[in-house]
């Protein structure tokens, strides 16, 4: 049984070895995330090269996601590496402080003093520490500790309710986009976007560097939630980044927001990745908790394209076992996923021919109970349209474009297959598609398949033809 939901795994010290990475890919990793918060450009080049070498050896298409660091809204370093804050004590955040202590800490983000005032609530280390702002004087923010605990170097800072003015794309991010293009990353994730303008800028920078990576907006700010539809429209996909998002909007609000984000992304023909602490306990444990199993399964049932692992595979003790567990959970959850066609989605007025053909293929496959859908595609757009509805029939995306193969590795219920050469005629296409699907063990003689293609062929966005084929009939396309 194939798995529809894709798995994104973060590369880190625990998964830097080629043998471990190979086992992870064999276990089910579809996209490898490179965290650009760590490492130099040459490090990312080497990591991307290793991913591609291992994926080629395994024989699976594996995409690469470059995750930009974004603005560093964090405390600075401490003289002893960490301090303990007591409830009720006074604590100062000082933009001019070099090394912190138990009474004050420095700031990486020097403009924080402009964004807060008396009455503001600051959440440190993913909300584990809560500070109430009393007053702001010059470079110093005077606070009282509401909820204390251990605070160590470089922990993140959020303002309850949002409102931090740091730009989404820093100078480092702009340099990193050029590196992402250099390594031919399939996806670039933008951290902390506040508006559609942030995503349009990221796209412009990618194109200016000569790249074609899909942009993924990480929804982790209150402002991003408020501008959600515009941000989705300006992006190729979104990441439900539940860590910082939960800190800003409150953890109880996240489950409903997750469902809304995934639904809106699918309605707009965009990708959705669900991330953060999905299998967190497996950093130290060989098995997930029951709550984590339910969390992953619910994301699958919500319709997410992919579920993502962060520290679990980057720094955990059991990176391979974590991927294996996530694969099992996804496959089991998919057995319960409702196979139905959204009538509201199908009854909308279509504005594109390729969209119309794509959804007609899904409708036909669902009602005719065919074995497979074969979509000849240049860019992957046709396959993406098809993946927005769950008809219970797998979509095999046939493409002569290597970069389209690895991009489609993230599309739910889409299985990309590389065609070594572009068919010159529709009869060649029919023959090559049948042969490829047969050689892969997907269909046998007598099976029905739905085939979509463009006429003329080789044009991105040109899908305009649908044909129902019985494998082995050997009839010409026009028959």
Which residues are covered by each model-predicted region?
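Non-catalytic helical/linker scaffolds that mediate oligomerization, partner binding
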Residues: 1-479
